[in-house]
């Protein structure tokens, strides 16, 4: 199933709903959230969960839902644990009245486990900016949508950025580019891409895995201090990001040569290091900040009514 067909089916289904919703107005569109507010990844999971819930609440308050049919947001805490994530999916997929219309796993590990289930259950998976990169091939994975970008495209973009700073792709030859990565399916996603580009452009590549949850990185950064890579990339998440940035500062690694994936670029990641994080870079697949019309509507229709899940001053974090 491609996205156009999915959209058409969804619209057709919603247009048919008022006949069921009239009178008691009981029919709701089930859009679940696989949240992780607890554990080592909670500092990043909490604002994601708050923002997602606030957006769905805004649609209900501003528009009466979708085409007048309210959204039912069912949450389940995964703790960013793959096993718990699969259990959450099984628990919520048949939630009445509509069943889950879409699932966002918010974890590459959980996404990998849910992909085989998607075509059987006919529940679309949105893994936007994460998950299995090869799932972008809709002919092979018709129920998975990982737009607007993938980890392979992010790795390519970061190498291109480095090349631009160094004077072109030819200037990469002989440079050292290291990757500090979360030792999981998520962190391993860019390895093949970076290895292939190293072979093509002649830079020396080395991957340095960091085990869950990422608090022990002394040896990693001592190795970086010793071997002096020209650039360090990071595929981190949660507390791993905070520790890495502090460790980089402690060995005085140049922050403007330290670049994180888009999941390593929040305020939560840099605040513990304070001014020492100045210059640190990260990728992104969207514009930052909370000054867009959707954010204004969240303030008006959600927080002004006391319905917000987080702090008003952290909208758009």
Locations of regions flagged by a protein language model:
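Periplasmic-binding protein-like
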Residues: 93-106, 126-128, 176-180, 228-238, ...
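C-terminal segment of classical bacterial N-terminal signal peptides
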Residues: 16-24
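Extracellular/periplasmic periplasmic-binding protein-like sensory domains
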Residues: 248-317
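Beta-alpha junction/loop-to-helix N-cap segments that form part of ligand/metal-binding clefts
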Residues: 30, 43-50, 62-138, 147, ...
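Signal peptide-proximal N-terminal region
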Residues: 50-73, 166-170, 199-202
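Bacterial N-terminal signal peptides that target proteins for export
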Residues: 1-10
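Extracellular/periplasmic Venus flytrap/periplasmic-binding protein
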Residues: 84, 94, 133-134, 142-251, ...
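Extracytoplasmic "Venus flytrap"
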Residues: 31-53, 76-83, 107, 180-189, ...
